[in-house]
Regions:
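A compositional/biophysical signature of low hydrophobicity enriched in polar/charged and small residues
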Residues: 1-170
């Protein structure tokens, strides 16, 4: 049975690899990744379509789940979330119940931006943002130590972000 992901109020298959994208669809996606606030008229001009045709294409890309949402990328340091911390987590048991309990709890960790199941010596990597080392120490003592089923946590403080992008190569 294929799993589904809820996006923009619609369900879509997780594997959208069957979707055929032409050159114009790809141009629309590239343009929206660079500036999602672009007006439909400006986007249409950029991809050589009429405004109504462009809007239909964008709506189609949304309904297919290829556009999951429109967001603002915020300045984390200006909002007291300038420190990035990567956390490696090892669970004490490798059971579906342990994984489910951890995953549910991880969603409630303050500042947690991402959580990934990984291969190798860790079961998960979490990426969180916080103000500074003092606020991270507080978060560690108040939340991370109480995550269910955790045997080991290893913390990696990011010293310098070399680059980060939200854009997928199309």
């Amino acid at each position: 049975m294929k799993s589904t992901t809820k996006l923009l109020g619609k369900s879509r298959p997780d594997d959208a690899s069957h979707v055929e994208l032409d050159r114009t669809d790809k141009a629309i996606l590239r343009a929206l990744q660079k500036d999602a606030s672009i007006s439909n008229v400006a986007l249409a001009a950029k991809v050589n379509l009429s405004a109504p045709a462009c809007l239909r294409r964008v709506e189609r890309l949304k309904s297919l789940g290829l556009i999951r949402g429109i967001v603002a990328l915020l300045n984390a340091p200006a909002l007291d979330a300038g420190m990035v911390v990567i956390i490696g987590v090892v669970l004490d048991r490798s059971t579906p119940e342990s994984f489910a309990a951890f995953e549910k709890a991880a969603q409630n960790v303050s500042g947690c931006m991402e959580c990934h199941v990984v291969t190798g010596e860790f079961d998960y990597f979490m990426m969180l943002r916080t103000r500074d080392s003092e606020s991270f120490n507080r978060l560690h003592a108040e939340q991370l130590l109480y995550l269910p089923g955790v045997r080991q946590i290893r913390t990696f403080m990011v010293l310098k972000q070399v680059f980060s992008t939200t854009q997928i190569a199309i």
